[in-house]
Amino acid sequence: MITAIVLAGGVGKRMGMEIPKQFVMVNEKPIIIYTLESFDRHPKIDQVVVVCKQGWADTMWGYIREFGIKKVKWVISGGSIVQKSINNAVQFLSDKCVEDDIVVIHDGIRPLVDEHVLSDVIVKCQEYGNAVTSLPYNEQIFIKETEKTTNKYIDRNTLRRVSTPQAYKYEVLHDAYDEAISQNIGMVDSAYTNTMMVDLGHTLYFAAGSDKNIKLTTTDDLALFKAYLREKEL
């Protein structure tokens, strides 16, 4: 069984929107539906749980029904930070997944996730027990000496950009969150499952990424998403 956790608990402050950004309409369709359609189409995804901003579950279910999304089985409430939202879903799945099941975690505001990226993260997880979507880092990275100066850089060949989707065997994921919460490791606002896993001593395995798999955080990101959609129509 392969279950996807899709996170849809954002508020959209950086976009200056009055509604959560995952519900912003693009071509008469909310952003979250573009994301869910990718999971609905993928032959290896069996079921989806959406972690939703509190108070928006009815809206989410309304769109799921309107656009014919079949694989979403549950919509649950998120937490105050993304790590608590993921943990809510992991705990919710405790009587719905067995130890060797694969759980794919994805940001709901990455609507351009494609079949190749999803397939590779699943295949790598089946082989190694986990997998994180990644890409080479193509910019130069400098370390601040002061707020105005630098005299050191990091060799970009030693770096990878990691995003979502990420995939983990359920038992390992569940045990990791239990350990992280009990020891207060990797549960801060800037953390995610991948950073928590490394903090707990796990080795992670890279899977294929895509430059199109952007996270819609700003209005510039939204404009880029619309441009990609226009490109697909050509």
Curated annotation (Swiss-Prot):
SUPFAM superfamilies in the record: Nucleotide-diphospho-sugar transferases (SSF53448)
Site, as annotated: Positions ribitol 5-phosphate for the nucleophilic attack: 156, 215
Family stated for the protein in its record: Belongs to the IspD/TarI cytidylyltransferase family. TarI subfamily.
Catalytic activity as recorded in UniProt: D-ribitol 5-phosphate + CTP + H(+) = CDP-L-ribitol + diphosphate
Protein name (Swiss-Prot/TrEMBL): Ribitol-5-phosphate cytidylyltransferase
One BP annotation, GO: poly(ribitol phosphate) teichoic acid biosynthetic process
A GO-annotated cellular component: cytosol
EC number per UniProt: 2.7.7.40
Job of this protein: Catalyzes the transfer of the cytidylyl group of CTP to D-ribitol 5-phosphate.
InterPro entries linked: IspD/TarI (IPR034683), Nucleotide-diphossugar_trans (IPR029044), TarI (IPR034709)
Residues the entry annotates as binding CTP: 7-10, 79-85
Highest taxon, organism lineage: Bacteria
Listed GO MF terms: D-ribitol-5-phosphate cytidylyltransferase activity
Swiss-Prot/TrEMBL site (Transition state stabilizer) positions: 14, 21
Keyword annotations of the record: Cell wall biogenesis/degradation, Nucleotidyltransferase, Teichoic acid biosynthesis, Transferase
HAMAP family: TarI
Pathway: Cell wall biogenesis; poly(ribitol phosphate) teichoic acid biosynthesis
